[in-house]
Amino acid sequence: MILFDKNKRILKKYAKMVSKINQIESDLRSKKNSELIRLSMVLKEKVNSFEDADEHLFEAFALVREAARRTLGMRPFDVQVMGGIALHEGKVAEMKTGEGKTLAATMPIYLNALIGKGVHLVTVNDYLARRDALWMGPVYLFLGLRVGVINSLGKSYEVVWKNPDLARKAIEENWSVWPDGFNGEVLKEESMNKEAVEAFQVELKEITRKEAYLCDVTYGTNNEFGFDYLRDNLVLDYNDKVQRGHFYAIVDEADSVLIDEARTPLIISGPSKESPSVYRRFAQIAKKFVKDKDFTVDEKARTIILTEEGVAKAEKIIGVENLYDPGNVSLLYHLINALKALHLFKKDVDYVVMNGEVIIVDEFTGRLLPGRRYSGGLHQAIEAKEGVPIKEESITYATITFQNYFRMYEKLAGMTGTAKTEESEFVQVYGMEVVVIPTHKPMIRKDHDDLVFRTQKEKYEKIVEEIEKRYKKGQPVLVGTTSIEKSELLSSILKKKGIPHQVLNAKYHEKEAEIVAKAGQKGMVTIATNMAGRGTDIKLGPGVAELGGLCIIGTERHESRRIDNQLRGRTGRQGDPGESIFFLSLEDDLLRIFGSEQIGKVMNILKIEEGQPIQHPMLSKLIENIQKKVEGINFSIRKTLMEMDDVLDKQRRAVYSLRDQILLEKDYDEYLKDIFEDVVSTRVEEFCSGKNWDIESLKNSLSFFPAGLFDLDEKQFSSSEELHDYLFNRLWEEYQRKKQEIGEDYRKVIRFLMLRIIDDHWRRYLEEVEHVKEAVQLRSYGQKDPIVEFKKETYYMFDEMMRRINDTIANYVLRVVKVSEKDEKEAKEELGKIRLVHEEFNLVNRAMRRATEKKKKKDGLHSFGRIRVKR
């Protein structure tokens, strides 16, 4: 009730703001196009900060509203203006399907773009980024802003007038798409001023990535914004960076991007050298293990736990004495992965096999995710299980979660149709409140209580009866399923019954638009996985409203109430009639794993007979509580990931800041002086600080430097300070000699070398961190807090890495010889071969990256492109 009252208070405040905007808008109505453009230029001079933007919100929103009316023939409703205010304030605006989020976003985008630091509109796919930029582009161009679009595969565009001369003429002669004298709320296409529609057409012109980011507004996907950030921190020249900072972003489908994908890091990776035979061997070994005897399955945590018998069996089969010995831990992870592939990951539910490839199915949308792979060798384990070619594992060069990427923005906002159920997570993780924006027309959809059966067989029989009944009266039905397997099972039952229908799942996603367009027509039956939720608009055909509108039938409850609400949201849009009902059984995954006992007791108390469903508000409430419990578990997992990644994020920023310092530095003398000082002082302090000097150990610790650099056998030192000064001066003299030898190219050569050293150490560090994550999860079974353990280990590891970076730089700047332009070009090409992966990531069930750990050279470097270093 308190939250509800708070939402009411916010809306009351917004309503007052809207009335002020309406007053200004009525004054603008009589002004010429050229005057509106002049007012926009004046505003741009006034708005230089978020505080200025707050002050000029009323004029800016009114200007956008009038510009949209004239260029698009669309006037944002008052509720859309409210949504825009919420977005400007850095909140999540919950706006139902069909309520016009795209248009609502133009107002805060314009206002914040006036500041001149760039605004990012984040969408979930390339098509939507292009579509929305083109659709809303005329508004921004009319008001003097530039609009860019970034797409995958390096494609970038600017939105420009299709016919600049005609657009100029339309502005000068005061043309408007909205005809004079039309006073309705919604302008239909046939009533629009055709001449103005033609004049305000826009198109995409290809530009560079950097130019797209220099536009006032940049549309793109969450993946591309994140990948560009990571790529920017791998460049060898500062001018190759494309982003210009993280100022203000609006995330469309915010719940999907910021919550559902929060466990899914963006990863830039390259190939590893793992042998496919290892995965095939363990796929065969896994078949010999008996469930509940050799191992147990934790379905809630999606992991496998070996019993003592299982451990003994594994040691015997693999031929090792102790499976948990540090040298064998990679074998343990291979076995766990193979068992997971066999018992936890199901074909046509979690993945499909197409053209000899294992392709992941998105658990939230049901869409196929080609290119995305499970990490840590799990994908290879599934490939081995299915007998398809095994693709090589990868090495991580750079990674970031969406949680940490989007928290870099000075101001972040989101919009979606379903957010209120996740408000606590939005607040805790991103500091964003959720504001529920009212619909323009009242919602009249009927949401029935759940029907619960004892078995899935009974449930499906009743679902088919319900579909048949509604089909016969001509009412369209959309049936939501949770997997491809279940959508095809239901389809086969309907075929036997002779009920015509269409199927929409990941296997038929190419036909999505066509299938969705028909879903609201009279007599149409559509079976869909969750993919029918996002970015689709189901319009009712003639006569359907009189039959009760589109009927949604849910065949199972999802772990998240939000996904169920998205399915319901397919009907009843913009005041249309509609209804929804969920058919459940005690054998459904959610109820079986988390609540069958409680619901079974209720059914026994009420003496429900076999085949007889129960439908009661109390039961619906009980199921909702089960979902809340599961949401809590999933939030806890995401929170654990975030706490771990927060540690990594501080370290990532430190490394990237060091890279920037090197990229921007005009002269490296001071920087290298600090490094030499660090190398010398740490060793003198360790081996020669007291009375007991250990010169032999000191010599060994400095043995990575060029031979003959130090003469510690002949010299006598009266104090550790004298020893320190001698060592430091020798390093400095040798560096100055090397600098002289390289000549004018020294800065370029040293910069190139230092960046490659940092990148190589950071890459290896990320790999080690993955191993630590896996190890601390195992320790959590021993009652140790995995977060505390992770922090302790990674803080030490990071300090060690920074020490190794300093040692390696100090060593290699004294050994380096001049690098040719050809060498540098080849190194850049090597960098270009890295892969971009939006990798499926599950904190609870990570697995090792290698079957056997190869001994690494102490402080050695794997590769620096073609740079040559004297040994």
From Swiss-Prot:
Membrane topology according to the record: Peripheral membrane protein
Superkingdom of the organism of origin: Bacteria
GO molecular function, one term: ATP binding
Location of this chain's protein in the cell: Cell inner membrane; Cytoplasm
Annotated residues for binding of ATP: 80, 98-102, 537
CDD domains referenced in this protein's UniProt entry, alphabetically: DEXDc_SecA, SF2_C_secA
One Pfam family of this chain: P-loop_SecA
Keywords: ATP-binding, Cell inner membrane, Cell membrane, Cytoplasm, Membrane, Nucleotide-binding, Protein transport, Translocase, Translocation, Transport
Enzyme Commission code(s) on record: 7.4.2.8
Main subcellular location: membrane
Gene3D superfamilies documented for this protein: Helical scaffold and wing domains of SecA, P-loop containing nucleotide triphosphate hydrolases
Recorded catalytic activity of this chain's protein: ATP + H2O + cellular proteinSide 1 = ADP + phosphate + cellular proteinSide 2
GO cellular component, one term: cell envelope Sec protein transport complex
PROSITE patterns named in the record: SECA, SECA_MOTOR_DEAD
Biological processes per GO annotation: intracellular protein transmembrane transport; protein import; protein targeting; protein transport by the Sec complex
UniProt keyword annotation of Translocase present: yes
Function: Part of the Sec protein translocase complex. Interacts with the SecYEG preprotein conducting channel. Has a central role in coupling the hydrolysis of ATP to the transfer of proteins into and across the cell membrane, serving as an ATP-driven molecular motor driving the stepwise translocation of polypeptide chains across the membrane.
Oligomer status and interactors: Monomer and homodimer. Part of the essential Sec protein translocation apparatus which comprises SecA, SecYEG and auxiliary proteins SecDF. Other proteins may also be involved.
Homology family: Belongs to the SecA family.
Name of the featured protein: Protein translocase subunit SecA
Lineage: Bacteria, Thermotogati, Thermotogota, Thermotogae, Thermotogales
